[in-house]
Amino acid sequence: MTTETKEQKKKMIIEHLTWDDSVNADNIKVTIEDGTAELWGSVQNYTAKMAAERDAYQVEGVRKVKNHLDIQFPPTMSLPGDGEIEAHLEKLINWNRELHAGHIHVECDQNVVTLSGTAESFWEKHVILHLANATNGVIEVNDQLRVKPPRVLNDEIIANDIREAFRRNYLIDEHQINVEVHHGSVHLRGTVPGFLVKIEANTIATYTSGVTDVVDDMTIAQ
């Protein structure tokens, strides 16, 4: 990628971030190298942080995004205290009937939440982390959760289940993605045609029985 092309891509990403009404792009710096865009600076909440990453992926030629954005709430915003955040998040987790929340511990210190304990599936862990990140007043989540499925499945069974789900999905060409599983941890590699396929493959792996972790090393084709 030439210097001129890099500057064009950078300009397009910044324009797309500025266009997105859910993102305050005033404090975002963008760098791009070899198709990898990096986002630096701060945004106003977790939703904006995830939206900024999605926006960068939508620009043609961006193959990977590294999201280094911090969350800085507006100075005029009234934030809940650590105890309020803990109590609110514990209620959210305990009231969700899909979650086996008996072994989850929540601690908050200076708006940084630490989650510890065990979840019965990786998708449950994924939901819990999303709830924590989206909670008002939380600037960071320290993930110490472990996944301990009630029934341990053979790695090859897990890998085959994921591959079969890929075959059934009209967005995914299963030949483009290499699936490796080691002690329940799924590693996805390969080059896919777009961001939607990347998200879809991650979602399938996340919701597959027996999975304890998902590592995404997929890149997007130029």
What kind of feature is each model-predicted range?
Residues 1-222:
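N-terminal targeting leaders
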